[in-house]
Amino acid sequence: EPQTAVSAVETSALAPKTNDTDARLRTLLYVEDNPANLMLVEDLIGRRADIQLLIARDGSRGIEIARASQPDAILMDINLPGINGIEALGILAADPVTAHIPVVALSANAMPRDIEKGLHAGFFRYLTKPIKVNEFMDTLDLALNLATSTSARVGAPKP
């Protein structure tokens, strides 16, 4: 019998952590070139009715989509064709249109120096592959909640 990517024990992590007053649809941009990783994240996010997933297959396209769509959070691979994830993060952080968006690294580069380099570059969090479902979903919730509270402050009328 084939094993599924997500065990039954882990599926509780996929339930949205929202209440009735916070039921708005959130947008996550995933920048990834590997089809297997795309499929896994699409499957995980597909179980969350509160998250809409946008996909870019390289860093340049990710930057374009981020500027045009203003996602609530971005999930980014490091090893991308063309502009890598760290370079893309730098471009997003330098642009006033996208600087506020939390960017989470999701990378196979799992050595401590890789993680330190990513966090130093400005990633909100640095997750490693293979994906640990509970950690992945908790981190997405943190990033999406940060985005919601930040946009609420930015959009709030001044007293």
Residue ranges and their predicted role:
Residues P81-N84, A99, M111:
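The feature encodes the CheY-like receiver
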Residues E42, I86-E87, A110-R125, D138:
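Alpha4 helix (beta4-alpha4-beta5 surface) of REC/receiver domains from two-component response regulators
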Residues E1-K17:
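C-terminal catalytic ATP-binding subdomain
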Residues A36, D58-R61, N84-G90:
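Acidic catalytic/metal-coordinating carboxylates
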Residues P35-L54, A121:
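Two-component/phosphorelay signaling modules centered on CheY-like receiver
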Residues S69-L75, L80:
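Active-site beta3 strand of CheY-like receiver
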Residues E64, I86-A99:
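Short amphipathic alpha-helix used as the core "switch/output" element in two-component signaling
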Residues T4-S7, I131-D141, T148, A152:
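C-terminal output helix
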